[in-house]
Curated annotation (Swiss-Prot):
This is Putative 4-hydroxythreonine-4-phosphate dehydrogenase 2. A divalent metal cation binds at H180, H224, H279. Belongs to the PdxA family. Its EC number is 1.1.1.262. Pathway: Cofactor biosynthesis; pyridoxine 5'-phosphate biosynthesis; pyridoxine 5'-phosphate from D-erythrose 4-phosphate: step 4/5. Catalyzes the NAD(P)-dependent oxidation of 4-(phosphooxy)-L-threonine (HTP) into 2-amino-3-oxo-4-(phosphooxy)butyric acid which spontaneously decarboxylates to form 3-amino-2-oxopropyl phosphate (AHAP). The keyword Oxidoreductase applies. It comes from Rhizobium meliloti (strain 1021) (Ensifer meliloti).
Length: 348
């Protein structure tokens, strides 16, 4: 399926493999709502993956009617059709769903859908992957050796490169040097090399999203960014040298700034991204700024991979009140990045 570009030429919509997430949360409702949106049909061709019975229950909860083309995995290609496609793996009886609880059945359902979506993109049958929220505890029930999605993705794709999570809002991105580790271990994981590597990956991902001259603000680790060494030396010994090396490479990067005001500065002064030193240093700010619009993007992969930044919301599952905003933004970001990657590949 093609759409008209700005110059009147025809261009193919990006094909996005969308994996249904945890069936016990709001994922079925979000998936159904998303597939019914007209602007999503204009932006991307979606191959949704899951169990049709679970999706139909989500549509009932959401109060939407779906017009989907059924397809098998063997029959898919990357051309895209007028209607979104649903691949029914038929692997979970709705009677086995315990709404509002993390279970082995829910974890198995979500991870199988996710694996299938990744394999489609890896095989060139999709330009990007998105997934609605699933629960890490349920994932560990199904795959005990995995703490988060990143290791799972790397193993499915046999990918050995660097993969990092970015949190994305329309006006600002958040990158982080460390992620899912105890707070007491953060300082020992910081180095000039680690920060510089994250800045390089952030710059590359921002370019894929259309930011040719990205402006990045770097947060300090300690209160008041160390206040000249009064509250810690990491800014002087590690963060400042990393920023200087990045600037020498031509990056438009500034900092370190105090973490309690760096996002205010970024929004006021037009920074495209803020790099924080640890997980919650950025997550708290991003979710206050735009919880219902936030997207998590896994950078460094051969294709865009996006999901809403919120979780499964077990407490409101089945009530028909889930906000589609972040899921919609995840699809739109994946579509934009897929188009940009395609354009860069064509120009190479």
């Amino acid at each position: 399926m093609t759409t008209s570009g700005a110059d009147g030429t025809k261009e193919r919509r990006p094909v996005i493999a969308l994996a249904m997430g945890d069936p016990a949360g709001i994922s079925p409702e979000l998936t159904a709502r998303l597939l019914a949106l007209s602007d999503i049909r204009d932006a991307a061709h979606i191959i949704a993956i899951g169990d049709r019975r679970i999706l139909d229950e989500g549509a009932r909860v959401a109060g939407v009617t779906l017009d989907l083309e059924a397809a098998s995995l063997d029959a898919l290609d990357n051309a895209g059709t007028a209607r979104h496609v649903f691949v029914d793996l038929a692997h979970l009886d709705p009677a086995d769903v315990v709404r509002g609880e993390a279970t082995l059945a829910g974890g198995t359902f979500a991870t199988r859908n996710f694996r299938t979506a990744l394999e489609l993109a890896h095989a060139g049958k999709a330009d990007a992957v998105c997934f609605t929220p699933f629960n890490k505890k349920a994932m560990r029930f199904a795959y005990p050796g995995y703490d988060d999605e990143i290791r799972f993705v790397a193993d499915v794709l046999s990918f050995t490169g660097k993969v990092r999570e970015f949190n994305v809002l329309e006006k600002v991105w958040n990158a982080r040097v460390t992620s899912h580790i105890p707070l007491k271990d953060v300082a020992s994981h910081l180095s000039v090399e680690a920060i510089l590597a994250e800045l390089k990956l952030t710059q590359a991902c921002l370019k894929d999203a259309g930011y040719e001259e990205a402006k990045i603000a770097v947060a300090g680790l300690n209160p008041h960014a160390g206040d000249g060494g009064s509250f810690g030396m990491e800014e002087i010994d590690i963060i400042e040298p990393a920023v200087e090396k990045a600037r020498a490479l031509g990056f438009n990067v500034e900092g370190p700034f105090p973490a309690d005001t760096v996002f205010l500065r970024a929004l006021k002064e037009g920074f495209n991204a803020v790099m924080t030193m640890y997980h919650d240093q950025g997550q708290i700010a991003m979710k206050i700024i735009g919880f219902d619009k936030g997207v998590t993007m896994m950078g460094g992969l051969p294709f865009p991979l996006c999901t809403p930044a919120h979780g499964t919301a077990y407490d409101i599952a089945g009530k028909g009140i889930a906000d589609i905003g972040a899921t919609r933004e995840a699809i739109l970001l994946a579509a934009r990045m897929a188009k940009k990657k395609r354009a860069l590949s064509a120009a190479a």
